[in-house]
Amino acid sequence: MKYYSTNHQVSPASLEEAVVRGLAADRGLFMPERIPTLDRAFIDGMKHMTFHEIALHVASAFFGDDMPQSDLRRIVEDTLAFDTPVVPVTDTIYSLELFHGPTLAFKDVGARFMARMLGHFIARRGASREVNVLVATSGDTGSAVANGFLDVPGIRVFVLYPKGKVSAIQECQFTTLGRNITALEVDGVFDDCQALVKSAFVDADLNAHLQLTSANSINVARFLPQAFYYFHAYAQMDRIGRAQRLVVSVPSGNFGNLTAGLIAHRMGLPVSHFIAANNRNDVFLDYLHTGLYRPRPSVATLANAMDVGDPSNFARILDLFGGDHAAITALISGSRTTDEEIRATLADVVRTHGYTPDPHGACGYHALMQRGLQPGETGVFLETAHPAKFLDTVETATGRSVEIPERLRAFMQGEKRSVPMARTFEAFKDYLLSQA
C-alpha cells in the first residue's frame, strides 16, 4: 500500500519510506491511500478471538502487502506482550486500561510496534547508516519510545521534552536509560519541542548528514497500531453483551489516539460516537463549535500529556473526512475539563466507585458525564496511564495512597542524564550535527 501526504504536494511513498522518513517532504503527514473495510463476519467473530489474533488481522489489512506474514506476526506478538482490559467503573461506564505495558502508558503499543517495524526495515536494507529517531514528548511518549527502542541495533533516539513540564516519574523513565537514548531538556513548552522535530525533517543540511525519522504519532507505524486496542475493546464488550451503541471518550492531546479510533471506525468498527476529551488546551473543541482551526500556545495542566496547542493529527482528521465539518461533528463531540474538574472527578470516582483513574482518564470520564448517556448506550473511556505516574495529583485529590508498580520503582532509582537545549532550531541543529 502507498501512503500519501496530507499536504498533497509530493508523490506517495511506500510503507518503508513512510516509516523511515516519518514526515513527508512537504511537511504533511502520511496517510494510507485506502482504508480497508473489514467484513462483518470478522467483527462479529472477534469475541471468540485473542488480542493477538485480532491485532494481526487488523495489521494485515494495512501492512500485509508490504512484509511477510511471519514477520508481521512476530512484530504483533512482540508488541502486545500485555493486555488492554476493559474494566467496569459504573453500570454503564467502562475503562479501557491501556497502562499495562512496560512504561505504564497507552503509547507502549504504538512505540513498541514502530520500533520493531523500523528495526525490520533497517535489517532488510542491511543499512550501515544509523537511523536517528527524533521524538517530542509532553509526558508519556518519551518513556514509551525510549523503552521501545532501547538497544535496537542501528537506531539512536533523541527525546525532546519541555523543562519542568513533565512529572518526575515520567521524566525518570527516559532520562535514566542511557545507551542509545539521549534526553534533550528544552527550555520551552511541548509545542516548541514538536516544532524543532518537524523543522529538522525538512532541513536539507541535517538530512544530508543524518538519517532522520520520528516516533511521534505523526509516524504511521506509531498511530495505526493504536487501532488494535479499539477492536479488542469492542470484542471484550461484545462478550458481555454491551457492544451495542458504544460511546468512546478519548483523552486527546496530539490526537493520534482519536485518529486511530476514527480509522478503526472507518474500517468497520461499530462505534456510535466519539468524544474528544480535552483539558484547557481545547483548540479542537473550538473547531467543533466554530468550524475554524485556531492553534494557540499550550497551557500547563494536571493532564500534562494533553497540553498541546497545535495538535499534529488534526491534519489527518480533516483529511479523513475530506474537510467536511458537518460529518466530523456528526461523529465526534468535544469536551473541556479544567484542573479543578480533574481533581473533583478523581475524588468522585474513587469515593463513589472505588476506581482510581489518572488525570487523563479523569478527563475521559468527565467528558462522558458531561455528554450523558442515552438509554441503551454504554460509555468507554480510555485510561491512558497508570495513576502512579501522577502520584502527587492523584493522592492529593483523592486522599488515598496509590501503590507504585515495581517496574516504575526501578526507573525511579536511576540517575538522570539530560542535555540542556535552547528552544531555537539553530541550537538543536548544531547539536544534532555534532552527533553525526
Tell where the protein language model's regions lie, with residue ranges.
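PLP-dependent amino-acid enzyme catalytic core
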Residues: 1-436
